Amino acid sequence: PKPPAEAKPAAKPAAPPAAANPFEGVDVKDPIVISAATRIQASFRMHKNRMALKEKSIPKFSQVLKDMFVMEGSAVTFFARVWGIPDPVIKWFKDGQEVKQGPKHEIKFDDKDGTFLIIRNADGDDVGTYTCQATNSFGEAFDSARLALEVPAKCTKQPDNITVKAGGNFEIKVEIAGEPEPDVIWTKGKKEIDEGGRFSYEDSPDYSILRVEKAQAGDAGKYEIEIVNDLGKARAYCTVKVN
């Protein structure tokens, strides 16, 4: 018998055809090609920048504080929205001094990057500039707003009654308050006292003074002081005796 034929090695598969070069025949000096390449590079850089922003960001205010004008004795709420990566630490300040949580002040946060400063029973001591500070490891941001009170006109201290010798000088002082700053009207016997001659005034946000020189018998009597602003009015009285 014939010996078995030797097995022939399998034929190697044919090599795949070389992939076509997508840039073959492209003129890199063509203005259209240059413009397209520039746009692609710019888009890639923007994508990298966006990714970097997702990884880190200094704090930024997306909603800033607003100035507040409120009635004395009411509650005040300052609100801001601020974000950053990592999340910033928030602090509140009044005229440069940190505001701490307590019976007078409450600091709150919501789940949308919002922060609140609540001031209870606002009074004159609360007037000033409030600042929200946001800080993380990449930087800090600030925003500020003012608090002003609206206070009805009032007399904070009644004037004293006066006794003066004829020919002497005297003054009547009334202490006042109000925001907006009140006007003061002086009258005697229902007649307004005009400035000039023996009569002069000194006015400030906290007081008003009527000065009278060389007192005469006709200066004796009851003086009325009316304190007025847009929110209200008040009256004060004083009696003068001339000996």
Swiss-Prot record:
Residues of the signal peptide: none
Region (Disordered): 1-22
Domain of life of the source: Eukaryota
Protein's job: This protein is the target of CAVP, which binds to it in a calcium-dependent manner.
Full protein name: CAVP-target protein
Stretches assigned to the Ig-like C2-type domain: 59-150, 151-243
IQ domain: residues covered: 35-62
Keywords: Immunoglobulin domain, Repeat
Feature: compositional bias, Low complexity: 7-20
Pfam family, one: I-set
InterPro entries listed in its UniProt record: Ig-like_dom (IPR007110), Ig-like_dom_sf (IPR036179), Ig-like_fold (IPR013783), Ig_I-set (IPR013098), Ig_sub (IPR003599), Ig_sub2 (IPR003598)
Gene Ontology terms, MF aspect: protein kinase activity
